[in-house]
């Protein structure tokens, strides 16, 4: 059984990026639920401040919401670099937050947040990093710049985020 991720599209701070691609799927097999998110950062931007949210404009810049009904109880996950980020910050982190109102250029720390993947340096092609924490049900996923000083629009950068859980 294949479905799309969450109850709708990502926030407009992601979906309105020129050239930005966001695709998702949720696969249920025998009580195991696999959620996959594919994002091309092209057209989104990073700011000059470490841990600011990646996106565009003033709209919410979340990738989507994790729910137990749709994505199950998450047990593990990973983030894989499919194309090295260029233009914007090449140190990209994944966070979860309880709020859906995080916007581009705002600090993720202004939300009730949890770091899921902290790159701690530039991503390289094929690099995979496991989740250091598990997103709770009803949290929203955000990408953040993991370094200061790179205020620019992305011209490249593709990631696959995979979450695995079970039916609650």
Task: Label every model-predicted segment.
Residues 1-168:
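Surface-exposed, low-hydrophobicity beta-strand/loop segments enriched in small/polar/acidic residues
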């Amino acid at each position: 059984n294949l479905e799309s991720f969450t109850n709708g599209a990502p926030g407009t701070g992601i979906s309105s990026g020129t050239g930005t691609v966001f695709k998702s799927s949720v696969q249920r097999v025998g009580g195991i639920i696999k959620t996959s998110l594919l994002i091309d950062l092209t057209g989104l931007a990073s700011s000059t401040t470490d841990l600011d949210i990646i996106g565009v404009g003033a709209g919410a810049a979340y990738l989507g919401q994790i729910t137990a009904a749709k994505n199950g109880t998450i047990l593990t996950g990973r983030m894989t670099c499919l194309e090295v980020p260029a233009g914007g910050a090449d140190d990209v982190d994944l966070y979860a937050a309880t709020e859906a109102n995080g916007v581009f250029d705002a600090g993720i720390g202004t939300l009730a947040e949890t770091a899921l993947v902290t790159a701690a340096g530039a991503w390289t092609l094929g690099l995979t990093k496991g989740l250091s924490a598990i997103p709770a049900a009803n949290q929203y996923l955000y990408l953040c710049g993991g370094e200061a000083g790179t205020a620019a629009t992305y011209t490249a950068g593709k990631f696959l985020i995979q979450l695995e859980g079970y039916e609650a």
